[in-house]
Amino acid sequence: MGISIDGKKYRRINMKNATYSSNEQGCYRWNDEDTYHYFRYDKIKWRVLEVNGNTAFLLADKVLDAQKYNNKIESITWSSSTIRSWLNGYDSMENSQKKDYTKVNFKNEAFSNEEAAAIEKKEVTDNTDQTESKNDTKDQIFLLSKEETSNNKAKNYGFLSNGSGYDNARKCKSSTYAKAMGTLSNFMLHDHGNCLWWLRTPGINSYYASDIDYYGYSGGGVPIEARFVGVRPALKMDLSNTDLWSYAGTISCNNTNNENKKYDLEQMQLVDTNNKQVSESSDEYIRIIYLALAKFVYNKDIDKNIGKSIHDIMISNDTIYYDYK
C-alpha cells in the first residue's frame, strides 16, 4: 500500500504482507505481525548491460522485491509463470494460476505512465532443456536468462561466461524493502548481505527455476515456490527522452559503486568531536561543509590556508563530523 507523508511516497507493509518471514539469521527483523513498517519510494538505479542506438538493456542494480517464481508447485516455464504476470501487470489469461495482476504488479508500482511508455517490448526466449514446449514471449519487464548471465553472451554484459565461477558482477544485495518482503541475505562475514535472485530459465527440472546465489554462482536452481528469493528485474528502455533518466555513475568489476554523490546542504548537520552541533548561521558551518564535500565528493585536498586546519572529517547519514589539528 502506497501512502504519502509530508509530500513523500512510502510503501507500508507489516509482517503479514511479507512473502517470507523467519527468525533465522539473514532475515528481516519484525517485532510483531501487525506493526506497519514504512519504506520510502526512491528512484530505481539500473545497471546498463548494453546500449544499441537509443535502446539501453538495463538490470536493476539491487534486488527490489521477494516473490515466488510461481504460486503453485507445478511444471512451469517463464511464459506461464506468475512472476511474469506480476512483473508486467498481465491479466488472468497469461499465467497458469489464472490470477489477475492488472491492479497489483511491479510495473505500476515502479514506473509512471510516461516511464512505462519508454520501456520497449523485448522478445523473451522461453529457453529450456527440461520441457518439450517452448513459448517465447514479448514482455516489457523480464528476468535475465541463464544464457545472459553465464554463457558466451554473458561476457558482453560484464559477467563471467562460467556459471560455476565466483563472479563479483553477478553478486547482488537487496533493497531494505525487498529484505522486509522476504529475501534471505547471507549473514556470513564474507559476501555479507548478498542474496539469491531469480533467473527465468528452468533449473534442474521444470519444478525449479535457475538463480544466482550469494557468491555469484549459477547452479541448478531453487524450487519455483520458494518465498525467499529476490526479484531483479530487467528491461530495455528508449533513451531518447532524456527527462526520464539521469546518469548515476559507474560500477567496477568488483561490484564497487563509483556514484555521482549528491548531498542536500540544507539537510546537513555539522558536529565537532565533542558532539557539539555548529550553528547553521555561522561562517564556520558553511566553510567546513564545503571542505568536507571537496574531500569526499570531489576527492580534492582540503585547503589548509583557510583558517584553522581541519582533519578527521567524516560524512555519515547527512552529518559531518570533524576535528581540528
What is the role of each PLM region?
Residues M1-V297, G307, I313-Y322:
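Collagenous Gly-X-Y triple-helix signature in extracellular proteins
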